Amino acid sequence: MSTFAFLLLCVQACLIQNVYGQCLGRGLGGCGCGGGLGGYGLGYGLGGYGGGYGYGGYGGGYYGGYGGEGVGNVGVAGVLPVGGVTAVGGRVPIIGGVEFGGPACAGGCVSICGHCAPTCGCGYGGLYY
C-alpha cells in the first residue's frame, strides 16, 4: 500500500469517527438526573416533560453535537423577568469562569441538572442552586 493510500485511509477513519461522535453524543454513563440514562431520553426520570420519557416525549435522546464556537461575554444587571419554558438539549461546553451572584426567585417547577467541574455534581460536593 502506498503512503498516499494509507494517509487517505487515516483521514477517512477520522472523518467517520467525527460524524458518529457528533450524532450519538453521550450515552449511558456519568451521573446526573435520571441515573445516567440521558442518552435514552430519560434525562429527567420516567415522568419527564410532555408525558413521555424525558424532554422529547417518546423519542430517543440522540442529539447532534455542539459544533460551534465563539466568545460569549454576557453581563446582566437589574431585573430580568423570564416566563415560559426553556429547554436546552445536547451539550453546552463552557470554558472559563461562570459566576452567579445574588438571589434567584423562581416560581413554578424549576429543574437544574447537569455537570459542573470541579465543585459540584458526581460526588464533588454540594449542589448550590
UniProtKB/Swiss-Prot annotation:
InterPro entries: Chorion
Superkingdom, taxonomy of origin: Eukaryota
GO molecular function: structural constituent of egg chorion
Disulfide feature: none
Example GO biological process: chorion-containing eggshell formation
A GO term from the CC aspect: egg chorion
Region (Left arm): 22-64
Renumbered residue ranges of the record's region Central domain: 65-112
Region of interest (Right arm), ranges: 113-129
Alphabetical UniProt keywords: Repeat, Signal
Signal peptide positions (record): 1-21
Task of the protein: This protein is one of many from the eggshell of the silk moth.
Family: Belongs to the chorion protein family.
Protein name: Chorion class A protein L11
Species of provenance: Bombyx mori (Silk moth)
Source lineage: Eukaryota, Metazoa, Ecdysozoa, Arthropoda, Hexapoda
